[in-house]
Each structure stands twice: as structure tokens, then as C-alpha cells.
Curated annotation (Swiss-Prot):
PANTHER family xref list: REGULATORY PROTEIN RECX FAMILY PROTEIN
Organism: Streptococcus agalactiae serotype V (strain ATCC BAA-611 / 2603 V/R)
Keyword Transferase among record annotations: no
BP terms from Gene Ontology: regulation of DNA repair
HAMAP family tied to this protein: RecX
Location(s) in or outside the cell: Cytoplasm
Keyword DNA repair: no
Phylogenetic lineage: Bacteria, Bacillati, Bacillota, Bacilli, Lactobacillales
One Pfam family cited in the UniProt record for this chain: RecX_HTH1
Protein name: Regulatory protein RecX
Swiss-Prot/TrEMBL keywords: Cytoplasm
């Protein structure tokens, strides 16, 4: 077989043979086999060219995908599959990219954690789940997470949350809100307990009274038309306790309000 034409088509080249067979190849393929118009090739060499072209094209696709941002091994595999790369050669492409350090899940985890420490608000449990979803092995994630102390980040977030809610919630509800928010963000109980203690939150009696009367008035307006005096009182007590107010404080406020 003779090569009758090699023509550039965007990122690939078209290779035409005198047996009317055409195939797409990469520039690396041309260089590797020193292909040129008029060259005679046999069936075995043609097969080698096809295999190399697929590998080269797959690698170039992977590099293109990685060029936008760091990717995990699983993400690159999925991208290659979506672009119809032969599943039999994907492992070879991945091994090649890993050997040249284009894919490195350990580095990905380190960067992910560091970015979260700098600008994020997630604790180790949420981080682990996010990384597992990206196909990274649990042992790699855990190894990197164990090297990080998340208390400073938890402390910074707790201070922001405290400023947000300190004038909106009674003491118990405020502490519960901080506990729930930090736990939901993936911080472990011991760290959450420590950073909340370190805030040294104290009860502001004047603020608590102001908040409880506002809430009491709100509940009264909502419930007074539906219930008699006794039922109304019980429902208001239950509603305020659910919002974190202490029973004795509620009773005291009710005595003055009703």
C-alpha cells in the first residue's frame, strides 16, 4: 500500500492510501513513523500506525481535558469514554499520563484540601465524600486528611456564624445552630465542641428578653384566634421551647404578656 495523501484537518491529519482506505492520525504518529506521501507500508505497519494513532489521539484528548484544570484519574477515563476512545487502550493512555505526572490523584487531593483551607468551609467528612465521588481511593484521601488540623478552619467558620446569629437567637438555640452548621459542613464532634467552647458565649439577659417577647408576640398573633386561653398558653410554650428558649424564661414572659 502507498500513502497518497497526508492532509491537516484541524488538530488531526487525514492519511489516504491507494487502496482507498482513509484514517485520521495525529502529528505524533507522523513523526513517530516518519510518514510521508509516496511511502510504501505493509498491513502490519498499517495496523501499528492505527494503534499508535489511537493511543496518541487519546493521550492528546486527555492532555486537552487536563489543560483547563487538574483532573482525577476517574474524570479523565470518563472523558475518554465519552469521546469514543477504545476501552481496551484507555488503561494504557492513563498509565502514560500518570507516568508523566499529568494525572496524580494524591496531588489532586492535596490541592483540593488546601483550596478548601484557604477559601472553603468544609470539614474532613464532607471533603472525603466529595473526593470519593471523583473516584479517588479512600486510603489516599484519608492519608492526606490525617495530616491536616481542621480546628483553625472550624474556629474561623464558627466566628462567622456567631456574628451572623448572635442577635437573632437565644443562647441555647445559638449553640445548637453552631453545632448543627459545623457538623453539617463535615467537622467532627470533638472539634466542633472545642471551637464553640472557645467562643465563650455568655447569656445576654436583655437580648434574650427582647427576643423572647418578639417571638411570643409573633406566636400569640398566629395562635390566639384558634385556641382558648389554656390551649393557647401550652402551644406558645411548646413553640418557644422548640426555638431554644428556656422554660422558666417563657413562663416569666407569659406572666407579663397574658
Amino acid at each position: 500500500m502507498k500513502i497518497t495523501k497526508i492532509e491537516k484537518k484541524k488538530r488531526l491529519y487525514t492519511l489516504e492510501l491507494d487502496n482507498t482506505e482513509n484514517l485520521y492520525i495525529t502529528e505524533d504518529t507522523i513523526v513517530h513513523f516518519m510518514l510521508s506521501k509516496g511511502m510504501i507500508i505493509n498491513a502490519e505497519k498499517l495496523e501499528n500506525i492505527k494503534k499508535f494513532a489511537q493511543l496518541s489521539y487519546g493521550k492528546n484528548l486527555g492532555l486537552y481535558y487536563i489543560s483547563f484544570k487538574q483532573r482525577t484519574e476517574k474524570e479523565v477515563i470518563k472523558y475518554l469514554q465519552q469521546h469514543d476512545i477504545d476501552s481496551k487502550i484507555i488503561p494504557q493512555i492513563i498509565d502514560n499520563l500518570k507516568s508523566e505526572n499529568w494525572i496524580n490523584d494524591k496531588n489532586y487531593v492535596q490541592s483540593f484540601i488546601q483550596q478548601n483551607l484557604n477559601t472553603g468551609d468544609k470539614g474532613p467528612y464532607v471533603i472525603k465524600q466529595k473526593l470519593l465521588q471523583k473516584g479517588i481511593k479512600s486510603k489516599i484521601i484519608e492519608s492526606e486528611l490525617q495530616a491536616i488540623n481542621f480546628q483553625d478552619l472550624a474556629s474561623k467558620i464558627s466566628q462567622k456564624l456567631y456574628k451572623k446569629y448572635q442577635n437573632k437567637l437565644p443562647l441555647k438555640a445559638l449553640k445548637d445552630k453552631l453545632m448543627q452548621s459545623l457538623t453539617t459542613k463535615g467537622f467532627d464532634y470533638q472539634i466542633v465542641h472545642t471551637v464553640i467552647q472557645n467562643l465563650e458565649i455568655e447569656k445576654d439577659q436583655e437580648l434574650e428578653e427582647d427576643l423572647i417577647y418578639k417571638e411570643l408576640d409573633k406566636q400569640y398573633q398566629k395562635l390566639s384566634k384558634k385556641h382558648d386561653q389554656y390551649e393557647l398558653k401550652q402551644r406558645i410554650i411548646n413553640a418557644l421551647m422548640r426555638k431554644g428558649y428556656q422554660y422558666e424564661d417563657i413562663k416569666s414572659a407569659l406572666r407579663e404578656y397574658l
